[in-house]
Amino acid sequence: ETTQALVTHPAIKSVDFTGGNVFGQWLIDNCRQARVYAELAGVNNIVIDSTDAYKPMLRNLAFTLALYSGQMCTTSQAIFVPAAGIDTEDGPKSYDEVCADLARAVSGFLSKPEVALAVLGAVQSADTLKRINEADSGALGKVILASTKLENPEFPKSEVRTPVLLGCDAADEKAYMEERFGPISFIVKVADTAAAIALSERIISTHGALTAGVYSTKADVLDAMTAATMRSKVALSINLTGGVFVNQSAAYSDYHGTGGNPAANASYADAAFVANRFCVVQRRYHV
């Protein structure tokens, strides 16, 4: 109530918000006296079609899913993999192989406690712990990699959890088509790459996203994904395998959000993010 009274006060002319949809939408609907710049929830996703750097791709994804225990608004939640699998430099990999290999990559990356604790940080709320436990139970999909609890001797009261990976079919939309904040990701089996791109676009257009990614060695696939993300207005990362990650999307070095899909009504930080906070007031008189 205190916050609501503050942000609707006539003297408040600019409101910046990052958080969940419910209060974010309340701000947009009720702060009529102010400009509201809101970053809300979305379903960030990645399409995997093919790769010529299979292990580097897995390492990159493992870091992405683990960083800050998935508690970044840019972290990928849904990874779309064709039912027939993907092509790699080591030959074809089935959907099940991709699932198992990504699980091994995450586990291997976090196998050293000093690395795991530095990358994961800690879970920030009891609600996130509940979501992790729900995912671990298998209620949302097949458990490919269960979350485990780690102890941090420097912060003995902290709640540290490794990522949980779930497998599901594209038809299981209730499971993966909403933001599940925390280290929870879905490897979604889709009919083919075209279906994956179409699904990615539909999710972003209807539910929003701050980031999208694609892995493919084929120019036509990259062109199709680029076109889809232009229509749905989301930042696209292509074939990231090194020290740059899809969830590292920061204002000033990148554009954080676009303001063009439901995940945010502004881009942090394009010219409008700054200029729209000001107005021009003129005065005239005879000389």
Predicted feature residues:
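Rossmann-like NAD(P) dinucleotide-binding subdomain of oxidoreductase/dehydrogenase enzymes
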Residues: E1-F63
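Short glycine-enriched loop/turn motifs at secondary-structure junctions
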Residues: H9, L40-G42, C73, E178-P183, ...
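Residue-level signal for inorganic ion chemistry
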Residues: V15, P82, P183
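C-terminal segments
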Residues: I28, A34, D52-F80, D87, ...
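Short, flexible, solvent-exposed loop/turn segments with mixed acidic/basic and small polar residues
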Residues: S69, E173-E178, A198-S205
